[in-house]
C-alpha cells in the first residue's frame, strides 16, 4: 500500500528529527495503511505526496457483488455490454459475435436499471460513463427481481433536472443491414420521462441452404432428396416507446407504452432438387415466395410501496400486449402449394407481492399472479381451419430468505401454479403443479464466493405445437400439430465458485446438471403418401456441463484478458436416443492504446455438435468466429469499426437429425455468419445538471405466436 518514499531522504536526516514529530509521522503512515485496507468499496486513488493508496473494485452485498468500473473502462466502452466485457465480472461473459451477455454456465441475464427491469434496447441506449456501479445478483430475494437466477442491476448517476439526447447509427457493409435510433430523457423533480425511436433493416440476398434427406417409407420404398437453395430475405422493423417514472422515499411508480412493427416483404428461394429411389418425384427446380408482417402494441404499469408498517413492502405490476401476425408461403414444384396464417394474440398479466420481515433480517415474500395467453389463428391453404388456444396460469408463491451472517444467506421458494388450457372447442385441461427452488449464497473471507442453486419447475408450453393442424409443406413433407402434448418439466442443480484474490484477477468455475422431462421432439412417419413431422413427448434430455473462466487485468487496467473453457455431456433417452460430448473455447481481450483509441477481440469455437432444444430435435455445430473491434472516443462521441468472422469468409451452421423414418443433414450459411464490416457511431447531447438517475424507457411487449412451425 505504501507505494514509495522519496529517495532523497537520507537515513542520517532522521537522526536529527524531533522524537515527537517522528512519532506523529509514524502514526499518520500507519493510519493511511489501515485506511487503504479498509476501503473495499472504492477505486479512487488518494495521493499524499509520494504515498499512493488504491482500494478494491468490488465488494459483497446481499445476494451478490458490487463492481465499480474504472475510469478507463467507462471512457472507452461504447455501450453497456462493452463496459461489462471490460470489467470482466466474475460469472458473466459477453459474446462479441452476438453482442449478448450471459452467465458462464450459459444462463440468461436479466437487466435492471436502478432496480427497475429493463429491456435490451433500453440498456443499449444507456451511456457507460453514467454507470456508478454494477450489481451482479444471483437469485436475489427482493420480489421485484421476479425470482430471476442472474440479474445485473445498473446503478446510474443522478439527475435533479435535465437529461440528454442520444443518437446512434450502425451500418454494416458486405452484409447489408442498418440500425438507427434516438433516445431522449428528461428529469424534473421526482419524475423521469423517456422516449425512444429505432429503425432497423436487413437485406440478405445470398443465403445458402443445402440439405440431404433420406425418407424411409418402408424397406422397399426409400427416397433420397438433395436440395441446393439460394434464399433472399429482406426485413425491416420500427420500434417506439415512452416511459414515465415517479420515485419518492415511499413510492416508485412506472407507466410505459410502446409499439413495434416488423415486416419481411421478401423471403424467396430458388431450390434445385435431385431425387433418387423408388417412387421418387422427378428432379427439378422449386420456387418459394413468402412474406410476413406483425405489429405489437403494449402498455405496462409497475408500483412499489416501501416503508409500510413493520418495515414491509408491497410490489405489483399489470401489463397487456397484443400481437397481430400475418404470413403466407407459396411453394411451386410442378403444382403450387399455398399456406397462410392470420393470427391475433392477447397477453394480459397481473401480479402482486408482499414482503415482510420475520426474525432479525430475514424476510418472507408471498406472491399471487395471473397471466393468460389467448391465440386465435386462421389457417388457409392445405389446411383451412381456425385454431384457438387459451392458456391460463394462476400462481401462488411463498419465498423465505434467511440471513445467517453478513457473508451467508439462503432462500427457499414453493410455487403452486395451476395451468388450465383448452384447444379449440375442447374442455379445459386443468393441471396443478408444485415447483420450487433452494439457493445458497456465501463468501469465505473476501476472496472466495460460493453459489448453489437447485430447482424444479413446469416449463411454459410452446403455443405453435398445441393445435390440430395437418399441413402439406412440399411435394413430400407435411407438418402436424398435437393438442394432447404433456407440458415439460425442468430440473437443474448448479454449483458456482468465484475466486477474486486481487483487483486484476478472478477465476470462476461452474458445474451444472439439467434435465427436461417429457421432452418434446419431432416424430417423422409416413401418412397418406407424405412424410409427416408430428410433435410428441419422448424421453428425457439430460446435460452435465462444466466451465472454467479465468480473467486477468494488466498494465493498470489497459489490458484485459478473459477465456472460458467449456465441456458438456448430453444424453437423450427418447426416440432421439443419443449421447455426445461437446467442447468450447471462448477467449476475449481488450487493450486501451491511448486516451482515445482501444481495440478488442472475441473468439468462439465449438469442437463438436450439441443438441438444439425447443422441439427441433436436431444436433448442430456452428463455425468458429473471430470478431475484432477498433474503437475511438472523444467526449460524448464514440465510433467503432468492427470486422466479423476475420478468419472465415463464409460462416455456417450444420445440423443433423436421425430417426427410424428420416435422416437429414443441413448446411446453412447466412451473411451475418460470415465476414463483414460494420461502423457504429454514437453521440449524446447533454442538457441540465446531472443529479438523478438514467434512462428508463423499455419496450415491454411480448412477441408470441401459435403458428405451426
Describe the role of every protein-language-model region:
Residues 50, 80-85, 99-102, 135, ...:
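N-terminal periplasmic accessory domains that precede
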Residues 39-73, 97-98, 138:
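Short, acidic, small-residue-rich periplasmic hinge/interaction motif at the N-terminus
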Residues 633-709:
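C-terminal beta-signal and adjacent terminal beta-strands/loops
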Residues 420, 446-493, 511-529, 647-663:
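Surface-exposed extracellular loop regions of Gram-negative outer-membrane beta-barrel proteins
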Residues 237-263, 287-427, 431-455, 501-513, ...:
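Face-selective signature of the C-terminal outer-membrane beta-barrel domain
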Residues 145-152, 160-209, 235-238, 251:
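Outer-membrane beta-barrel translocator/receptor signature
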Amino acid at each position: 500500500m505504501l507505494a514509495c518514499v522519496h529517495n532523497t531522504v537520507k537515513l542520517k536526516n532522521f537522526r536529527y528529527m524531533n522524537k515527537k514529530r517522528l512519532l506523529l509521522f509514524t502514526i499518520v503512515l500507519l493510519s493511511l495503511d489501515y485506511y487503504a485496507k479498509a476501503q473495499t468499496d472504492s477505486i479512487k486513488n488518494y495521493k499524499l505526496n509520494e504515498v499512493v493508496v488504491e482500494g478494491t473494485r468490488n465488494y459483497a452485498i446481499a445476494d451478490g457483488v458490487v463492481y465499480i468500473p474504472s475510469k478507463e473502462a467507462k471512457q472507452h466502452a461504447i455501450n453497456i455490454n462493452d463496459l461489462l466485457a471490460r470489467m470482466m465480472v466474475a460469472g458473466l461473459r459477453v459474446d462479441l459475435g452476438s453482442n449478448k451477455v450471459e452467465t458462464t454456465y450459459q444462463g440468461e441475464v436479466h437487466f435492471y436499471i436502478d432496480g427497475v427491469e429493463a429491456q435490451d434496447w433500453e440498456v443499449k441506449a444507456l451511456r457507460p460513463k453514467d454507470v456508478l456501479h454494477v450489481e451482479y445478483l444471483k437469485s436475489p430475494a427482493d420480489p421485484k427481481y421476479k425470482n430471476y437466477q442472474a440479474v445485473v442491476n445498473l446503478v446510474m448517476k443522478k439527475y435533479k433536472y435535465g437529461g440528454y439526447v442520444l443518437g446512434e447509427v450502425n451500418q454494416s457493409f458486405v452484409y447489408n443491414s442498418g440500425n438507427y435510433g434516438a433516445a431522449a430523457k428528461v428529469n424534473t423533480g421526482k419524475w423521469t420521462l423517456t422516449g425512444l425511436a429505432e429503425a432497423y433493416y436487413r437485406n440478405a440476398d445470398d443465403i445458402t441452404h443445402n440439405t440431404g434427406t433420406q425418407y424411409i417409407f418402408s424397406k422397399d420404398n426409400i427416397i433420397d432428396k438433395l436440395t441446393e437453395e439460394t434464399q433472399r430475405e429482406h426485413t425491416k422493423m420500427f420500434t417506439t416507446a415512452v416511459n414515465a417514472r415517479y420515485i419518492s422515499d415511499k413510492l416508485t411508480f412506472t407507466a410505459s407504452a410502446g409499439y413495434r412493427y416488423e415486416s419481411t416483404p421478401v423471403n424467396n428461394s430458388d431450390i434445385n432438387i435431385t431425387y433418387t429411389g423408388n417412387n421418387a418425384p422427378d428432379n427439378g427446380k422449386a420456387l418459394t415466395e413468402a412474406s410476413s408482417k406483425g405489429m405489437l402494441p403494449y402498455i405496462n404499469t409497475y408500483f412499489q410501496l416501501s416503508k409500510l408498517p413493520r418495515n414491509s413492502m408491497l410490489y405489483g405490476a399489470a401489463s397487456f400486449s397484443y400481437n397481430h401476425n400475418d404470413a403466407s408461403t407459396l411453394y411451386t414444384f410442378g403444382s403450387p402449394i399455398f399456406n397462410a396464417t392470420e393470427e391475433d394474440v392477447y397477453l394480459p398479466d397481473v401480479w402482486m407481492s408482499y414482503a415482510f420481515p420475520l426474525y432479525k433480517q430475514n424476510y418472507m415474500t408471498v406472491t399471487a399472479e395471473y397471466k393468460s395467453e389467448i391465440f386465435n389463428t386462421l389457417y388457409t391453404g392445405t389446411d383451412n381451419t381456425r385454431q384457438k388456444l387459451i392458456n391460463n396460469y394462476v400462481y401462488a408463491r411463498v419465498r423465505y430468505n434467511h440471513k445467517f451472517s453478513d457473508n451467508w444467506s439462503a432462500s427457499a421458494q414453493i410455487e403452486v401454479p395451476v395451468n388450465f388450457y383448452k384447444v379449440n372447442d375442447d374442455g379445459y385441461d386443468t393441471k396443478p403443479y408444485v415447483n420450487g427452488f433452494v439457493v445458497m449464497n456465501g463468501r469465505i473471507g473476501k476472496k472466495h464466493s460460493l453459489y448453489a442453486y437447485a430447482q424444479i419447475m413446469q416449463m411454459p408450453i410452446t403455443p405453435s405445437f398445441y393445435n390440430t393442424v395437418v399441413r402439406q409443406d412440399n411435394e413430400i413433407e407435411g407438418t402436424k400439430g398435437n393438442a394432447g402434448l404433456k407440458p415439460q418439466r425442468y430440473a437443474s442443480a448448479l454449483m458456482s465458485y468465484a475466486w477474486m484474490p486481487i483487483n486484476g484477477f478472478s477465476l470462476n468455475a461452474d458445474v451444472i446438471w439439467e434435465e427436461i422431462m417429457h421432452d418434446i421432439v419431432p416424430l417423422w412417419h409416413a401418412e397418406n403418401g407424405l412424410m409427416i413431422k408430428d410433435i410428441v413427448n419422448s424421453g428425457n434430455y439430460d446435460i452435465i456441463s462444466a466451465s472454467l473462466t479465468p480473467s486477468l487485468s494488466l498494465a493498470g487496467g489497459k489490458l484485459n484478458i478473459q477465456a472460458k473453457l467449456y465441456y458438456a455431456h448430453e444424453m437423450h433417452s427418447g426416440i432421439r436416443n443419443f449421447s455426445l460430448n461437446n467442447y468450447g473455447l471462448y477467449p476475449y481481450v481488450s487493450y486501451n492504446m491511448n486516451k482515445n483509441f482501444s481495440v478488442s477481440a472475441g473468439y468462439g469455437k465449438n469442437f463438436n455438435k450439441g443438441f438444439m432444444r425447443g422441439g427441433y430435435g436436431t444436433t448442430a455445430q456452428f463455425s468458429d468466429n473471430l470478431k475484432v473491434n477498433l474503437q475511438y472516443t472523444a467526449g460524448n462521441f464514440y465510433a467503432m469499426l468492427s470486422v466479423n468472422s476475420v478468419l472465415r469468409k463464409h460462416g455456417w451452421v450444420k445440423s443433423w437429425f436421425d430417426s427410424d423414418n428420416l435422416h437429414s443433414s443441413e448446411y446453412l450459411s447466412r451473411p451475418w455468419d460470415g465476414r463483414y464490416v460494420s461502423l457504429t457511431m454514437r453521440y449524446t447531447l447533454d442538457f441540465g445538471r446531472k443529479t438523478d438517475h438514467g434512462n428508463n424507457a423499455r419496450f415491454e411487449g411480448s412477441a408470441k405466436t401459435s403458428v405451426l412451425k
